[in-house]
């Protein structure tokens, strides 16, 4: 079973405490120390090798994610420089004894689809086969082929990636659910129509809700732990 969590605050020793509090639920952690420079090359933020070793002793895989953080230009620079970027990712994985990479590049369009797929192909080719490649993809309940949903060729991405991680959240633009059951189910069903093995499909769950202003698109994210602790 694949159970992973992103981690957005580097990889300090406090991370070990957070992981231990999950009581063995996780088997993969994905910290945020892969960034994209403005020229499309890799920026590696500090990662503590001793912390990585401590996670490995806990039988956890360490698979950092690479994201453009919704910056379309940055994502396109990465694709234009994809040969070098794939090699740099491979080198970082080897140097730090990491277990793979999660690619989380968003807000591209159907015009970028082929280059994005080729980037994933290059990443898969550049790193050892036993290392993991996963790709975060848009939830697409209505099968859109234009806009940022259209940047993901689900069928061909699955040929190179070990896992496709469906980002089943941020459903509503106005006041509404973050991830309603019907919307999530349709998103899963669509991916499965794209000739993808169910074993490669990972469901991304939101650890947050939203506080909406009526009639406005603006909202404030509220982490789940605040809701549970009744501090929200």
Swiss-Prot record:
Identify the catalytic residues: 106 (proton donor)
Entries under InterPro entries matching the protein: Chitinase_II/V-like_cat, Glyco_hydro18_cat, Glycoside_hydrolase_SF
Which species does this protein come from? Bacillus subtilis (strain 168)
Q: Which family does it belong to?
A: Belongs to the glycosyl hydrolase 18 family.
UniProt keyword terms in alphabetical order: Carbohydrate metabolism, Glycosidase, Hydrolase, Polysaccharide degradation
Keyword Methyltransferase appears in the UniProt entry? no
What Enzyme Commission number(s) apply to this enzyme?
A: 3.2.-.-
For this entry, the protein name equals: Putative glycosylase YkvQ
Q: Which residues form the GH18 domain?
A: 2-232
Instruction: Extract the GO molecular function terms from the UniProt entry.
Output: chitin binding; hydrolase activity, acting on glycosyl bonds
Q: Which Pfam families match?
A: Glyco_hydro_18
Q: Kindly indicate whether the keyword Hydrolase belongs to this entry.
A: yes
- Name the gene: ykvQ
Would you kindly state one Gene Ontology biological process term found in this protein's UniProt entry? polysaccharide catabolic process
**From which lineage does this chain's organism come?**
Bacteria, Bacillati, Bacillota, Bacilli, Bacillales
